[in-house]
Amino acid sequence: MTLYFEEEGDVKLPLECEALAKRVVEEALDYVGCPYEAEVNLLLTENAQIHEMNKEFRGIDRATDVLSFPMIDYPEPGTFDFLEEQEDCFDPESGELTLGDIVISKEKVLAQAEEYGHSPMREYAFLIAHSVLHLTGYDYMEDEERQVMEQKQREIMERLDILR
C-alpha cells in the first residue's frame, strides 16, 4: 500500500501522523477485503483550506473535518470484483489500485477530540477509517447505510485497538 502524505499549515498534531495513517488505511482495506495493493493520497490541512475545498466541491460554505474524493464508482460498497476489467482504476506504473484522496483538517481533529473526550490520535484514526470507507464505496445517504458505515467504523477501530 502506498500512502502519499502531505501536510500544510502551522497547526501540528501531537502524533506520528504519517505512520498512523498508513496503519489505519492498511487495516481498513484489509477489513473491507480489498484484494489489491492500493494507493491513497492524504492531505492534512487547516480549517481555512478545507473550508474552501468544501465550498468548491460540495457547495457547503463552512469548514469540515474530513473530505473524501473517491476515484472509483462502485456498483456496491466494498465490492472489488468488477475492477478486473477496469484498467483505468490502476496506476500504470505501480499497478496499485488508485482509491482517491483524503483531506483532513488538523484543527477539527483537535477540537473534536476535545469535544468528544478522547485523544487526537483516536479522532485522527477515526476520520481516516471513515474516509477509507468512502473511498471503497460506502456512504450514508440513507439511515440504513449510515448504520452499516458506523458499525464498520467501530469494528475497524476495535481491530486497531484505538478505542474511546
What annotation goes with each model-predicted range?
Residues M1-A125, L135-R164:
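An acidic/histidine-cluster motif and surrounding catalytic segment
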Residues I128:
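A glycine-rich beta-strand to alpha-helix segment
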